[in-house]
């Protein structure tokens, strides 16, 4: 079976609720939430994505797939764990060191959430080998 995770990044605020209902009818499996802080990446979507998560929390049971493209991963994890997402993916390169990567993995898993670890294409995959037994998904960014 194939799962579909639908990104809400380009949905206009005034259409979010209608769009969510249409995507439910289309049997999407997850809502993909692209969280950007304007520091780790150029765009800043944090406020609107947080607002979308609040809407989703009230109108649907479809699980969330949170993708954190942020510099301060620890604080953003806390902001999104309250929505009980299915998975939170964060960027290896956003962490100060490997200890911080493991701390974040543990924190996410302690909250009954799956963990995804994202890497930039130029990052040597060997750098994350030690984390593979502890994560559910590895995402190699190409954007």
What are these model-derived regions, one by one?
Residues 92-96, 143:
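Short, acidic/turn-prone active-site loops that include or flank metal/cofactor-
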Residues 118-122:
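Short gly/ser/thr-rich secondary-structure transition/capping motifs
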